[in-house]
């Protein structure tokens, strides 16, 4: 497989706020969404190689055959469908008696200038990136509360900290996911449940293919041609750029967060994510000026 993850848990030095170094002793059960490729697939392998019982899910179960061969349990799961979510969670509870960790990884990026993105596309973006994790979280929380233990890991993005022209819809969905996670952390802490945000920068996956598909379906107004030219450049999006992380880098952070007795609340992954976090503290006029210069240079 091209995205094999490291077979051992390494000390995490990538987090903005690191958790306790102590690892949980017993192998546990994890439910991971969006495992057809990239981060999700690599994360499922990393958990399995560390003796977790892994339920790897995707919209099309046929995309999970290699994970099944590796020892993962697989299931078809559409994060936008309540019945699909309940069916998978009920199966895990019946087979394992509980869910120790939920990794909300499924997602995609709807790029494009705000004016050009139809409302129905915005709704679809939020249905997958925000309402999907919300559905899964609501489904697993009663069981985690009963066990007085559990970890919910939401895979966000540096775009959940910093928005940019052409990325407002995607960033909006990730900003929302971060807000939900912040609130949830305070709500469930008393029940022994941890809520963690993992915030990758660009990652070498097929994520860019979906970006191009979504942008290709937009009306593409001439008024924003410079933004489209930037988005047409694969390296400008970042998926194959020199600062992109590998899926195994993200998988390692997710596994470490799930294995910690006291994980940190946030883990940026990769140089772009770390600098993106710092960019939030740059005065808005200065940040806008830099974006304007970048548009002129790259557009």
Question: What are the residue ranges of the model-derived segments?
Answer:
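Conserved amphipathic alpha-helix within the SDR
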Residues: 73-76, 83-97
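Residue(s) in the substrate-gating loop at a strand-loop-helix junction
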Residues: 157
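Active-site helix of classical SDR
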Residues: 137, 173-176
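Substrate-binding pocket helix/loop in short-chain dehydrogenase/reductase
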Residues: 113-114, 121-123
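Conserved glycine-rich cofactor-binding loop
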Residues: 36-37
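A glycine-rich helix->loop->beta "capping" turn
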Residues: 91-104, 110
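C-terminal beta-strand-loop-alpha-helix "lid" module of Rossmann-like NAD(P)-dependent dehydrogenases
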Residues: 189-241
């Amino acid at each position: 497989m091209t995205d094999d993850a490291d077979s051992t848990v390494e000390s995490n030095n990538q987090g903005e706020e690191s958790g306790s170094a102590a690892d949980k002793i017993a192998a546990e059960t994890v439910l991971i969404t969006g495992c057809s490729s990239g981060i999700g697939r690599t994360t499922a392998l990393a958990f399995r190689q560390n003796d977790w019982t892994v339920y790897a899910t995707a919209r099309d179960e046929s995309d999970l055959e290699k994970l099944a061969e590796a020892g993962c349990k697989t299931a078809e799961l559409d994060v936008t469908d309540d019945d699909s979510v309940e069916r998978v969670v009920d199966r895990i509870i019946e087979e394992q008696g509980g869910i120790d960790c939920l990794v909300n990884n499924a997602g995609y990026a709807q790029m494009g200038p705000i004016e050009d993105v139809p409302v129905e596309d915005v709704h679809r973006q939020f249905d997958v990136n925000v309402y999907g994790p919300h559905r899964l979280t609501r489904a697993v929380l009663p069981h985690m509360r009963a066990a007085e233990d559990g970890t919910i890991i939401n895979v966000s993005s540096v775009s959940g900290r910093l928005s940019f022209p052409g990325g407002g819809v995607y960033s909006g969905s990730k900003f929302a996911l971060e807000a939900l996670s912040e609130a949830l952390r305070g709500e469930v802490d008393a029940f022994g449940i941890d809520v963690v945000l993992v915030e990758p920068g660009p990652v070498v996956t097929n994520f860019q293919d979906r970006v191009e598909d979504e942008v290709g379906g937009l009306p593409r107004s001439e008024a924003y041609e410079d933004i489209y030219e930037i988005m047409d450049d694969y390296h400008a999006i970042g998926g194959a750029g020199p600062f992109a992380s590998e899926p195994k880098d993200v998988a390692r952070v997710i596994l470490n967060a799930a294995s910690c007795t006291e994980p940190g609340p946030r883990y940026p992954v990769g140089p772009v994510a770390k600098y993106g976090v710092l960019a939030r503290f740059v005065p808005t006029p200065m940040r806008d000026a830099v974006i304007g210069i970048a548009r002129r240079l790259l557009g």
